[in-house]
Amino acid sequence: MPMVSAQVDDTERYTVRDYVRELAATGGSTMLIGGQILDLEGEHKQLSEPEVRAVYEGKTAALLTTALRFGAMSANATEAQLEAVTDFGYNLGLAFQVIDDILDLTASTEKLGKTAGKDVNAQKSTCPALIGMDGARSEAKCRTQAALDALMIFPEERRTRLVELANYLLNREY
């Protein structure tokens, strides 16, 4: 099996060690693993908005942010650009999860391609359950706009695809 260093080249700003550090931080107890634990422990309990946000942050937002940071690092992003991509990923990840929870309540199993209503059946606290459908839609729009605002550091031609992605995710039906 090849070593990580054989698959990833250093850039002017980032080394293989930086990528490994990013990956380790994302997978750790405060991010993906921690988010999954919070999610499982939250079943059959009434979580507060900050607790639900912590689940979203630790799972969807962390995963999306890390993927985007890897792309930015491989493109030799400056510190300011990396921060902008981080903000974009964080907010887009939260918006994605809110929309996912809305779709779990409103879309069919056939449309989703997965079992609809799983959150209700597991008695999970979700954004729509806590603040209603209109509040959840508003939250998703606000988070998407915050994600788009974070990209303003980049020239228009460099952000077009990410803007399209953000708008697609906000308006998706599955």
For each predicted feature, which ranges?
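All-alpha prenyltransferase/terpene-synthase fold signal
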Residues: M1-Y174
